[in-house]
From Swiss-Prot:
Biochemical pathway: Cofactor biosynthesis; ubiquinone biosynthesis
Coiled coil: none
Catalytic residue positions: D288 (proton donor)
Gene Ontology molecular function terms on file: 3-octaprenyl-4-hydroxybenzoate carboxy-lyase activity; metal ion binding
Main localization of the protein described in the UniProt heading: membrane
Membrane topology reported for the UniProt record: Peripheral membrane protein
Subcellular location: Cell membrane
Enzyme Commission number, as recorded: 4.1.1.98
Organism whose genome encodes this protein: Wigglesworthia glossinidia brevipalpis
Pfam families: UbiD, UbiD_C, UbiD_N
Family membership: Belongs to the UbiD family.
Subunit and partners: Homohexamer.
Binding-site residues, prenylated FMN: V175, Y176, R177, R189, W190, L191, R194, G195
The name this protein goes by in its record: 3-octaprenyl-4-hydroxybenzoate carboxy-lyase
Length: 489
């Protein structure tokens, strides 16, 4: 599915009747959250609020509210397409030389797709059609949402934060929430291990910290492919802009900022330009994807020097809360992306599942074709290590390939019948944990547990292992033939 920018993607959604324009005045203060929450829980359309109360700028919400729309944003039609993308990412991470003609034919489409991965630098761009600086910089002109009753204030949620470390060749793009504290100041909430925070730390430890200020740009209303690229486990040597071009089948056009050399998506609706210094402020509390309000913490203040916009710009926002919300829907879609990456490293993996009700990543379930003693433990350690996204996974449940890991009833049966709590659990202390996980004993440091719910082999148990009950196939087929005639239901 080919498109250029957010506006052209909205036209695609309109063509397929997957977006709704709401002309009734609705307040960005709590009301849009409630409407979006009800809509997403019924797998409803994306929403454009044409008249947010008190604002002239429309507000887009619930863009990624179904896995189908996530797939469309990534260039496909449905979630099956995302599995194919996972194979491309797996190839890009660890490319292999072709061994025969069949391998060459299989690789060719991948290289064809890569032709869109080169960025195109432009001198004029829609995102700079209107430029505001100095006293004209005013975030209060944007319908930034306050999502939950106890939130401290308005919160920017879908901004793509663009940074570059002093010794890096390419930029980093991350999605971090930002609290508005003044008309030209926001708090940059990023965790220490995230790319933007690492760039800032590197800058503070460099000579440049004494010579200049650390530039930051935030793209609001970027094209959906670039947004999703910022939350996708792409190879470290591949830029988000390049991967976005692959997704939307169009090269990403970028333009240099007004106030710095940072390059931003040319078709973004709004760009915030500014700088960080050593000033910090208390951030929060805010309702988060866990379904709870987070603690108040101190983070850097971003001073905004310029706002550039498209004419008739649109503000793109979301809310986060107890699943189901947009992050959990994106997590469901990206789950399909992870599977080929994991299978490339561990071919014995049959399926992998991140239940959306578990805050996207805190519990994972995997099914394997068991091959040797202790196999489940090896898989646990591998999953915790292979991708940064799984660093915060607290629970890993490993099942045999006869278990449908997308079905909690099957999982619970497997745990209740194949697990001895002492023998089949792997506990690890003092591991990285999500800063928002207040259940951990310490901030950023907690424990993990792996549960081996596979059938145990001789050497893993001294007892005779149970044989699962199954009906004969002949009988099942016979009853299938007469089932409708029985009129039981």
């Amino acid at each position: 599915m080919k498109y250029v920018c957010l506006r052209s993607f909205i036209k695609i959604l309109e063509k397929h009747k997957k977006i709704k324009r709401i002309f009734v005045p609705i307040s960005p203060n709590l009301e849009i959250t409630e409407i979006s929450h009800r809509t997403i829980n019924k797998e409803g359309p994306a929403l454009i609020f044409e008249n947010p109360k008190g604002y002239k700028m429309p507000l887009l919400c619930n863009l990624f509210g179904t896995t189908e729309r996530v797939a469309m944003a990534m260039g496909g039609k449905d979630i099956k397409y995302i599995r194919k993308l996972g194979k491309i990412i797996s190839f890009l991470k660890t490319p292999e030389a072709p061994k025969n003609i069949k391998d060459i034919l299989n690789i060719a489409p991948k290289f064809k797709a890569m032709l869109h991965m080169f960025t195109k630098k432009v001198n004029n761009a829609p995102c700079q059609e209107e430029i505001f600086s100095g006293s004209d910089v005013d975030l209060t002109s944007i319908p930034i949402m306050k999502c939950w009753p106890n939130d401290i204030g308005p919160l920017i949620t879908w901004g793509l934060t663009i940074t570059k470390g002093p010794y890096k060749k390419r930029q980093n793009i991350g999605v971090y929430r930002q609290q508005v504290i003044e008309k030209n100041k926001i708090i940059m909430r990023w965790l220490p291990h995230r790319g933007g925070a690492l760039d800032f730390l590197s800058w503070k430890n460099s000579k440049k910290a004494y010579e200049d200020k650390f530039p930051v740009a935030i793209a609001l209303g970027a094209d959906p492919a670039t947004i999703l690229s910022a939350v996708t486990p792409i190879p470290d040597n591949l830029s988000e802009y390049s991967f976005a071009g692959l997704l939307r089948k169009n090269k990403t056009e970028v333009i240099k900022c007004i106030s710095s050399d940072l390059e931003v998506p040319a078709y973004s609706e709004i760009i915030l330009e500014g700088y960080l210094d050593d000033k910090i402020a208390e951030e929060g509390p805010y309702g988060d994807h866990t379904g709870y309000y987070n603690e108040i913490e101190r983070f850097p203040i971003l001073n905004i020097t310029h706002i550039t916009k498209r004419k008739d710009s649109l503000y793109h926002s979301t809310y986060t809360g107890k699943p189901i919300d947009e992050p959990s829907v994106i997590g469901m879609a990206l789950n399909e992306l992870f599977i080929p990456i994991l299978q490339k490293q561990f071919p014995e993996i049959i399926d992998f599942y991140l239940p959306p009700e578990c805050c996207s990543y805190r519990i994972s379930v995997v099914s394997i074709k068991k091959q040797y003693l202790g196999h489940a433990n090896q898989i646990m350690m591998g999953i915790w290590s292979i991708l940064r996204q799984f660093m915060y996974t607290k629970f890993i449940i490993v099942c045999d390939d006869d278990i449908d890991i997308r079905n909690w009833k099957d999982i619970m049966w497997s745990i209740s019948t194949r697990v001895d709590p002492y023998r089949d659990t792997l506990l690890i202390k003092n591991t990285p944990i999500d800063y928002l996980d207040f259940a951990s004993e310490k901030k950023n440091l907690g424990s993990k547990i792996g549960i081996d719910a596979t059938n145990k082999w001789p050497g893993e148990t001294t007892r005779n292992w149970g044989v699962p009950i199954k009906m004969d196939k002949i009988i099942k087929d016979k009853i299938d033939l007469i089932w409708d005639d029985l009129n039981i239901f």
